[in-house]
Amino acid sequence: MTRRFALVLALVASSAEAAAGQTAKNYTPADVHFVAGMIGHHAQAIQMAGWAPSHGASPSIRVLCERIVVAQNDEIVFAQRWLREHGEYVPPADPRGHIMQGMDHPMLMPGMLTPEQMAQLDAARGPEFDRLFLTFMIQHHQGAITMVQQLLAVPGAAQDGPIFRFASDVNVDQTTEINRMTLMLNDLKRSSQ
């Protein structure tokens, strides 16, 4: 009986060691695509917001832009760290790195500004910059929400706790900022009449 118990104990211990040696992959390719995509997506938002001081943005737009830069930089750091920790490719935080991979033809990620829109925003100054910034950033944020919805629509995706929290935070933060920016844009339109 002792010998049998020792044998069972040895088998259980060796199974536990084998299981511990294999890291359970609790994420999907959709999770990786989402996290990697957010790096380029957020980099474009940071570039847009970074133009506020040099483009004559109003004080309220500058404050909004500072918040966007801080929040999205933090999320880029999270995304890069998560990808590294999971042995996945970490794309550069390049605002031009916004083409969806795996497509037969280049396609912008949801909400991303085209090169023409970026040039239009970069050329704008003062109240015109404010108006275009709000219009384009609302579009950009709506795209991030679409990316979250696409992730959550994939069976098995966002089961990893940090990814679920990240996607949820993106959804809540972007929705809140869209509401704020819509009010700001409406105020801007009223004041220019």
Question: How would you label these PLM feature ranges?
Answer:
Residues 19-193:
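All-alpha RGS (Regulator of G-protein Signaling) helical domain and cognate RGS-like helical scaffolds
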Residues 1-4:
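Positively charged n-region of N-terminal signal peptides that target proteins for export
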Residues 6-15:
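Bacterial N-terminal signal peptides
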